[in-house]
């Protein structure tokens, strides 16, 4: 339903829904006459997006995405609306990649491609038609900040290995880069949109000094194969002064739920 704050009138939107379908997200666009309404079937493997007119209540379908398994929840946060376009991420190519649509629902182009995943769309710079995003192109254990220009040239902006995230200014000219890795607590820098570090905001040097006084076990990455031949990543922490000739009790932790990657090159205790 929509509610007109001036007329005090409530209107029911004409959203096509399966008997067991539901609406997981409703988003404002930059057009007051287009309300983005996203629906899923109960199996959660078919997503439809409609633009609804709050006054007429008519809803027009502008996008459908389907999966053999399920639609990841992260797709919702990567839909960003601009005056003439919107972004969308999908696994329809086999990997999670970024797509660029017109507000009429026409696919303009697939922005990214390759055997890696786009983890987050950061934004679009209208001045030079550049896209900014985070992906795990280097390793499934790491994430870096990238830019793709109007000609499709890709540039890696983050310089430190590990897990990088970024928050851009409204005009897409600056961003805060937050990163850590297995041996480095969180560091936050202010960068321009070429990746140049303008200022270091957080170093966590005091924390590193404090930790140096203690014998803290370090994580070690390893890989193993499942019974059906799939390679998986893991990490282990051995006791301080570990001896391979001794036996130790083992605490094993494993969780395979969606959106829950546990093995990452990031700092934690």
Model-derived segments and spans:
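Beta-propeller folds
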Residues: 1-174, 180-186, 190-193, 216
